[in-house]
């Protein structure tokens, strides 16, 4: 992984100079943008460019396991929380908190069902 277009004089016009600093911070982003060097998996993980590294040949299996894990969660709240996290970037704290509340409020029925299941003893120790 890397910003290989640097080697050929091709500018980053695909949003790379905007998105990369938001993902890994300005220092790491400038390092990658300016040098065009290759980044190995362990370094990408350390700098926050990726969230997980799996052994060679196991990427599909790991991706499917993650997809199944996410699919098992209540979907309305999962989607609302994801949307809130994405929308909050760059917002003032108070505005982001209000937006989070607005999105979460729409999912309260699902949350009450989940709380009832937990109170009944389900879901303890991370198991459902």
PLM regions and their residue ranges:
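C-terminal alpha-helix plus adjacent terminal tail
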Residues: 36-41, 61, 65-68, 72-128
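Crotonase-fold acyl-CoA enzyme core
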Residues: 3-76
């Amino acid at each position: 992984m890397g910003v290989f277009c640097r080697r050929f004089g091709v500018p980053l016009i695909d949003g790379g100079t905007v998105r990369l600093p938001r993902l890994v911070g300005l220092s790491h982003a400038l390092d990658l943008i300016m040098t065009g060097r290759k980044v190995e998996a362990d370094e990408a993980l350390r700098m926050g460019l990726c969230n997980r590294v799996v052994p060679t040949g196991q990427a599909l299996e790991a991706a499917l396991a993650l997809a199944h894990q996410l699919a098992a969660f209540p979907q309305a709240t999962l989607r609302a929380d994801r949307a809130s996290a994405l929308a909050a970037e760059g917002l003032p704290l108070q505005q982001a908190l209000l937006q989070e509340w607005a999105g979460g409020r729409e999912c309260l029925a699902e949350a009450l069902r989940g709380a009832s299941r937990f109170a009944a003893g389900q879901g303890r120790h991370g198991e459902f």
